[in-house]
Amino acid sequence: MLDKARSQSKHMDESNAAASLLSMETTANNHHYLHNKTSRATLMNSSQDGKKHAEDEVSDGANSRHPTISSASIESLKTTYDENPLLSIMKSTCAPNNTPVHTPSGSPSLKVQSGGDIKDDPKENDTTTTTNTTLQDRRDSDNAVHAAASPLAPSNTPSDPKSLCNGHVAQATDPQISGAIQPQYTATNEDVFPYSSTSTNSNTATTTIVAGAKKKIHLPPPQAPAVSSPGTTAAGSGAGTGSGIRSRTGSDLPLIITSANKNNGKTTNSPMSILSRNNSTNNNDNNSIQSSDSRESSNNNEIGGYLRGGTKRGGSPSNDSQVQHNVHDDQCAVGVAPRNFYFNKDREITDPNVKLDENESKINISFWLNSKYRDEAYSLNESSSNNASSNTDTPTNSRHANTSSSITSRNNFQHFRFNQIPSQPPTSASSFTSTNNNNPQRNNINRGEDPFATSSRPSTGFFYGDLPNRNNRNSPFHTNEQYIPPPPPKYINSKLDGLRSRLLLGPNSASSSTKLDDDLGTAAAVLSNMRSSPYRTHDKPISNVNDMNNTNALGVPASRPHSSSFPSKGVLRPILLRIHNSEQQPIFESNNSTAVFDEDQDQNQDLSPYHLNLNSKKVLDPTFESRTRQVTWNKNGKRIDRRLSAPEQQQQLEVPPLKKSRRSVGNARVASQTNSDYNSLGESSTSSAPSSPSLKASSGLAYTADYPNATSPDFAKSKGKNVKPKAKSKAKQSSKKRPNNTTSKSKANNSQESNNATSSTSQGTRSRTGCWICRLRKKKCTEERPHCFNCERLKLDCHYDAFKPDFVSDPKKKQMKLEEIKKKTKEAKRRAMKKK
């Protein structure tokens, strides 16, 4: 069983070593290890022999030393794990058996520290060499899962196969030294170090590995105060615990790292151990990136990680830098992580199908909704007040390195304030790994160029590492900084967003004056209030509640009720319902149910207000005169006075009892068209009758012999040739019973004419004295005898008959007459055009 486990672990080690070699060959920093193949073969044999010897030595409880590994700046690599993160699940990189043994000895990052103990104790040197191999391949495999490094990032890795160890140069590629160090056993400890960023700008930190740990190693709290200087090393030569640099947010990284024992070979590949490997990997992912604050540290803000592990009994330091340490100092070891290490929490690390350009080119404009209320809301001064030093430290996005346009990130919208948007969309997290600080045009703003021509625009995003300074300088009073507009959004959500983004985000001048901001804010507010805008607000407060004449319920001025800029609901005038007399039932009950209501009946009903005597006017409502005169306009634009409907007036009137008159024999037409009680209106109706001869004739036909008859056959012939024979016979019958006293009738008519003219104009009644052609055409008649002006212009026969002609009463003849009128009208227009 042990042999089977060894063969499996051997096979896994070889495959992992091959994968790590392929990933290392792609980097620019590790291109120089290929020439040293002899040392690689020697190291392979030494590590395999050391494995066999270690199993015998561990059971005897031999003392193990603590070799110190010196690590230069370990640059993280972006491999296929970033494109397909499922590889990190299929192949765990924190497992003990995944340790490759084929690490080339010429790799630059990890070297055996040379000292006086190298030749004295070969076991200790073998442990150091094997642990060097372990850390190198672990670093290549583990860092590839989480790192998304940029090729623009500066590297502190030495180009020659040398490594600084506490200020000394260690030559590990010498064939004599590598030959002298023959391995006899491997280290039983295969711990994984936390990924904490350590600043190694000038000095290189040392890494001490505990060689005999059998338990879970927890990160203790730092035992030294946090140092924010970028040049501080993670471990000093005089202190065993060292001092690490904590992050600005104060969040330590509590990583739990599983260490397996080589003596228990049967449980190495057991399900529990596999679960512990995956859990440790997940803990590295989840705990290392606890919040967005831990990602907001810049490249100069590092996090110090600490390892504490138990050693075997009698463990002692392995080099001269730890000879001074006591037994308690041996319990703690300081781990060094890559300097430019970065955990990408953006969407491309969780979803392999999402590409970088699709994720970062969208812009969220939902925070522009209330941008018109405050000055700082639309002036866009969220991060434009960063000084020149923060701008020089702000990395340029690698995707827009040439176009220098900033990119928004979905995960950074939590930095928006409630009603405020920043001047720049926050750049994506992957852009912080590129530190292109050699941009000479970063602070040079060409004020005359187009804001959308972003080829020479520099990119300024959020400087996450400088959180306290950013918060202090972020007040809306710091508006005199240089403003760089972001690029236009790739996706326009509505038809107003293009104009809105030009007004808010792209001024032609880079100034942020108060007047310009006020103008832009006013323009944005106007755009938001348009009816086609999706940002239109309907809850505008009423400025003055008492002044309801100027504003309605929505605060819209009533002077422009139907303007396109304001809603027209609630500002319409109330509709006045008017019931015309022709559509009303008669006031008095009619004996003839088949009576036709026409304009003649309107005439009879219009006379009702004037039947009152002087005493009857006292009973009227005082508001009657004002309510009867309704000022309206006809379709030609003329102003006319209209009275209210007749039933409303009749309810307010008290009609006095009038003198009854005898019915005439020839009153058949009047009895058939009007109500039976109409004749009770007798004298007052005749006294206010209109003055036209046709209506005089009708009054003579209808009423008593007090008024002489004027409808002689000669008068009928002169006034209308188309009079019915029936009407002529009626006129003859009535003339037999009435005396021919025309002089008395003319005097009475002249006196009534003047009274009727004044009363009709004062009350605003329509005239019924026009000819039948004008009444049929609904035109104003000039009432000229024998032909009015309209009939003479159209060359039509003018009819002033007392009763309706057949082309008015008969519908078929009426239609024919209307067609004739149309033809005559066209002919008259042609003649008028010819005269012009």
Curated annotation (Swiss-Prot):
What does the UniProt entry say about where the protein is found? Nucleus
Which SUPFAM superfamilies would you find in this protein's record?
Answer: Zn2/Cys6 DNA-binding domain
A Gene Ontology biological process annotation?
lipid droplet organization
UniProt lists compositionally biased (Low complexity) regions at: 226-236, 273-305, 381-398, 426-446, 680-702, 740-751
PTM per Swiss-Prot/TrEMBL: Phosphorylated by RIM11 and MCK1.
**Annotated effect of mutating residue 526 to Q:** Impairs gene repression activity
* Effect after changing residue 528 to P: Impairs SIN3-binding and gene repression activity
**Which spans does this entry mark as compositional bias, Basic residues?**
718-739
Q: Where is the composition biased (Basic and acidic residues)?
A: 1-14, 117-126
| Residues of the signal peptide | none
Quote a single Gene Ontology cellular component term: transcription regulator complex
Q: Which of the residues bear the PTM Phosphoserine? A: 114, 141, 150, 228, 316, 318, 645
**What residue spans carry the region label SIN3-binding?**
508-594
DNA-binding region as annotated in the record: 771-798
Disordered as annotated region, ranges: 1-77, 92-168, 218-332, 381-464, 636-766
| Additional detail | Present with 217 molecules/cell in log phase SD medium.
Q: What does the record give as the function of this protein?
A: Component of the RPD3C(L) histone deacetylase complex (HDAC) responsible for the deacetylation of lysine residues on the N-terminal part of the core histones (H2A, H2B, H3 and H4). Histone deacetylation gives a tag for epigenetic repression and plays an important role in transcriptional regulation, cell cycle progression and developmental events.
| Record's subunit section | Component of the RPD3C(L) complex composed of at least ASH1, CTI6, DEP1, PHO23, RPD3, RXT2, RXT3, SAP30, SDS3, SIN3, UME1 and UME6. Interacts with RIM11, MCK1 and IME1.
Protein name in UniProt: Transcriptional regulatory protein UME6
From which organism does this entry originate? Answer: Saccharomyces cerevisiae (strain ATCC 204508 / S288c)
Lineage here is:
Eukaryota, Fungi, Dikarya, Ascomycota, Saccharomycotina
Q: Which gene encodes it?
A: UME6
